[in-house]
């Protein structure tokens, strides 16, 4: 590994050259003599997404790519056939950079995902516009030969419904089989099976447990492919949809680990360590009796012994931000493991921007080298070869939804090459910058938000503003490209996005401060963000609007009645009127 580190040092000058090139490109874009706002269709035109994965050796790159050139071309979304046939699966030999189209799509059918099984063969999942009952899985060699159907969805003969296969996981220890789930549309259960890729035979691993009044959300599987536990949420009774329970399997069935309600402290087990005994998870160290060890308010990462039921240690804790919040639908924690699962390289989570924690020096060096080559952007390494010499990484920012690059350490001349860009046409225009900020509410609560100023903004200028609260309300905003915010900002408006109390990501206490406050302090938090921006000298207070969707739309409509003197216009869409009715009839 030290030799590879030396190679990294040797190519740092190439990365510096790349940084200079990018700087010159961005500089040319930013010094246009006459500002021309980006056309609306360019902002709302989403590029054709792509999935990429390196083969285990890193010698081949597989990708689902657009059939046509990735240009901004808004199509009729009712043309389902066109939507279903716009991507093909391509494998590129990285030594020659020659691509090979393995499989396209037929009318009404599309590839939904793929996975390298080894350097020669890929597993492909296919779907159909005709419905879930037409899904299938097959293997294909990297040269496009030996296409073999493994399993497909089937309708039941003697009862209504059908069974749909989907990939659950690939395990390095078992190269000849994969773990799949079979979804039963009648019972809504997902049973686990081994699928042999040579014989096509399936072997039952576990049937989904039937817990009265609860529905299984997911399995907890170890590195041997053995289910060790599962999580449910309440489907019936007064706690419907707001209570989660975690179980572990025992010799005679299963045993409850703990339950937690919405907003309560909760430990969410996520990944097994390679010892198949220790579980890594996020949340609070909650004991079966409800007591909390070393309460942290924000969700921390813990290691947990599945056999003894004891918490081993708190691995990492950020006092300001949750390391994701699975209980509230936030699965943003990204953990990086070695190819065989024996080592945790590190992880990332969402603070004001993406935060990264490293446990492996080499992996940290790779990431930091790439970050230095793309200043002002967020860099995320998401795939790598078994020998850690080739990496795929994404680059995105507040002005760009992202591109994918290949980093080849063995290529000292051109170590970094772009292989896909989500919306390349955006680089032709000047877009607005978004910056995180913090502010204090009128009752002394520290809150977070994002400020976006127009590309033409001049220091000291007071400009029209739009307050743009997110939906949810149990959600949050993130730093990155937002076409709606860019639409406002490129038309000359400043934009404020605020994570008012009740937002996720900032701990339980801040979330609970929103209880009984939907039309009260939650609403005032939005106005206080505006007042903060005004104190900084940005706002023309005679020209302020508020816009939002879902709960954000509710907040906009509340503003029309609660503080009409602040706003010149209200923009509300996809409004959750149940919020309005609930506020009229209840203090909850």
Regions found by a protein language model. Give the residues of each.
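Non-catalytic accessory segments flanking enzyme active sites
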Residues: 50, 216-220, 231, 346-347, ...
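Conserved small/polar residues in nucleotide/adenosyl-binding loops
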Residues: 578-585
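N-terminal signal peptide c-region/cleavage motif recognized by signal peptidases
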Residues: 27-28
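Cap/lid segment of the alpha/beta-hydrolase catalytic domain
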Residues: 426-536, 540-542, 549
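Primarily recognizes the serine-hydrolase "nucleophile elbow" in alpha/beta-hydrolase
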Residues: 531-577
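Beta-propeller folds
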Residues: 32-390, 398-400
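Bacterial N-terminal signal peptides that target proteins for export
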Residues: 4-19
